[in-house]
């Protein structure tokens, strides 16, 4: 369950020399290995753990659902973090250095960073709100029938705020980028 699933993370750089845009290569690699990791966890859950810690009836369906509850938010957060990191740092040279665009336009970088961070925070808060309500307080077992206990008003508000902030700061980053190009 863990050895193979976490070993595939080492494959994240498989597109490094095949895609010219470092951020695109890193994000695609990250999403790809998260998908592989999800598949490993599902196979393990549906075969090894069925009947032990997972109900044996519908073990595969339970494993698909259970593993999606943490792999989907984790994939979104990892992809956003990798996108931000590869936009800020240059990993293509012998020594890791600050990306040239940051040196040229700090306002764009800060705005883009806040944009990504607001989306990541919204995903984390939403995941905590949803998944906390899915855990049976008596047994501690994940119980999808408890989904009605989720405060979807909170989830909707947090999602909306996160998306609005993400878009607003992305626009600010684009505007500052365009104005910096006009100055140069």
Regions found by a protein language model. Give the residues of each.
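Loop-helix junctions at membrane interfaces
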Residues: 1-184
């Amino acid at each position: 369950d863990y050895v193979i699933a976490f070993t595939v993370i080492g494959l994240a750089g498989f597109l490094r020399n095949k895609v010219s845009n470092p951020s695109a290569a890193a994000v695609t690699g990250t999403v790809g290995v998260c998908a592989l990791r999800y598949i490993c966890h599902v196979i393990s859950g549906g075969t090894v753990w069925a009947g032990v810690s997972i109900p044996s009836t519908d073990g595969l369906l339970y494993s698909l659902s259970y593993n999606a509850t943490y792999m989907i938010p984790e994939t979104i957060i990892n992809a956003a973090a990798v996108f931000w990191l590869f936009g800020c740092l240059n990993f293509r040279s012998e020594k890791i250095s600050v990306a040239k665009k940051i040196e040229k336009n700090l306002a764009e970088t800060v705005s883009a960073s806040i944009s990504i961070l607001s989306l990541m925070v919204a995903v984390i808060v939403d995941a905590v709100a949803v998944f906390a309500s899915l855990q049976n307080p008596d047994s501690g077992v994940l119980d999808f029938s408890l989904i009605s206990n989720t405060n979807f008003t909170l989830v909707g508000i947090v999602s909306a705020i996160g998306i609005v902030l993400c878009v607003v700061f992305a626009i600010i980053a684009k505007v500052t980028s365009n104005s910096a190009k006009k100055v140069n």
